[in-house]
Amino acid sequence: MKNINPTQTSAWQALQKHYDEMKDVTIAELFANDSDRFAKFSATFDDLMLVDFSKNRITEETLAKLQDLAKLQDLAGAIKSMFSGEKINRTEDRAVLHVALRNRSNTPIIVDGKDVMPEVNAVLEKMKTFSQAIISGQWKGYTGKAITDVVNIGIGGSDLGPFMVTEALRPYKNHLTMHFVSNVDGTHIAEVLKKVNPETTLFLVASKTFTTQETMTNAHSARDWFLKTAGDEKHVAKHFAALSTNAKAVGEFGIDTANMFEFWDWVGGRYSLWSAIGLSIILSVGFDNFVELLSGAHAMDKHFSTTPAEKNLPILLALIGIWYNNFFGAETEAILPYDQYMHRFAAYFQQGNMESNGKYVDRNGNAVDYQTGPIIWGEPGTNGQHAFYQLIHQGTKMVPCDFIAPAITHNPLSDHHQKLLSNFFAQTEALAFGKSREVVEQEYRDQGKDPAQLEHVVPFKVFEGNRPTNSILLREITPFSLGALIALYEHKIFTQGAILNIFTFDQWGVELGKQLANRILPELGDDKAISSHDSSTNGLINRYKAWRA
């Protein structure tokens, strides 16, 4: 990968000049000037997904200049480096190969001279055998009863991904009830344990090192709770499995290492749902549906790695994002799924994007003088319409939005889905084209209102429009299409990081807080006043101690 400051390229300078020409052009004008705009600025993927990016403040010239930037930053070389197993995560000296986990073609992928695919397939086969035993009821708990509940204990990538996918694929779930515990706040594990029976519960402890503070604290609390009923520690092996690489610690915990499912250093946490971390997904929807999820992601991987940049969906979305973030000064992007099953999708890619590209140092170790990752947020429609859409429509901040919806619902109740989709279509139209003062005034006249009253109301009912959106319309949310959609966003994030000359696959920003927490923890064990920190931290700790006493 080339380590080039993008702002020093001729393409960036050309984009800056182009922005000066485009900043006052409206989306309405762009549509008025081109009757074929939708056809030119939309694309389909496998007849399963339509991506419409026509309601953006872009022209063909904009995209051409953004493509020039991608070429000068050697995006094609970066893609090749990732897929070939090069150690592009240089700060940790690791390859980045979540694509290998879903490599359904089984073509060799080499890391350190070794094809990783046999090991990937071996773990998949092991998960298949284990999950079939649990789902079928063949696996028995310590009293001879079949498993009814599964509790996944993890945090970050070991929680967000599996939780998001099991919720998104809830129409495909079997009889097992899934629970997810992540927060070290004891309330989280306590509330879950109230719902389950130790005789019929399986705990999955998801920690690569088996030392993650939050996960192991919750795991030990779950173990203590279990043993209060089960008594004998040998029963732990029937009710706990591990997603880890630390066989010694797993065995010491009481888990049979035959029920330890491994993954590798080249699997980043926020890209790990495709690995053994996805065991909870398999237990929820079955192995065949998990393979479909992998297959959908693999199909998007092939699209990303082989399709020319001009028609490459992850690249196009990434470039449009850079355009807004760096030239228009947009600081956030909203992800708005119009599907209740997808209610954790925005939260998942909040981590996926912000932990990946929330960096202020470039690949040369220098502080950047441009914008890197945006703030990602969002909620399902139509809930968001009655919450924060006001600011998107009439606020002073530009918030580019991704609207996501399935054409076919899993729950065709009455006319619910038509009403949902009517809002989906209406919102992007309203954001793009707005409502002029003239239209508002005419509406008041048509209603017979007193013209003298117009000035008191009209300004507040005007919508400027010109708010950019992408619309992603899926035929239906299935394991395959969900896999493709997740991979689309993953590759968008990678593309932006490659072009912006940052390391996307490390996350050193999470370390300092953990280090300080480990120093503070012993200080909370007594009632002595603390004076070893700044006055604010001392004051907070001392008030905590006073109140808990």
Curated annotation (Swiss-Prot):
Signal peptide: none
GO molecular function, one term: glucose-6-phosphate isomerase activity
Transmembrane segments: none
Compartments (UniProt record): Cytoplasm
Root EC class: isomerase
Any single biological process term in GO: glycolytic process
GO CC terms, sorted: cytosol
Major localization listed first in the record, in broad terms: cytoplasm
Biochemical pathway: Carbohydrate biosynthesis; gluconeogenesis; Carbohydrate degradation; glycolysis; D-glyceraldehyde 3-phosphate and glycerone phosphate from D-glucose: step 2/4
Pfam families for the chain: PGI
Gene3D superfamilies referenced in this protein's UniProt entry, alphabetically: 1.10.1390.10, Glucose-6-phosphate isomerase like protein, domain 1
Recorded catalytic activity of this chain's protein: alpha-D-glucose 6-phosphate = beta-D-fructose 6-phosphate
EC number: 5.3.1.9
Active site: residue positions: 355 (proton donor), 386, 514
Keywords: Cytoplasm, Gluconeogenesis, Glycolysis, Isomerase
Role this protein plays: Catalyzes the reversible isomerization of glucose-6-phosphate to fructose-6-phosphate.
Similarity comment: Belongs to the GPI family.
Name assigned to this protein: Glucose-6-phosphate isomerase
Annotated source species: Salmonella gallinarum (strain 287/91 / NCTC 13346)
Originating gene: pgi
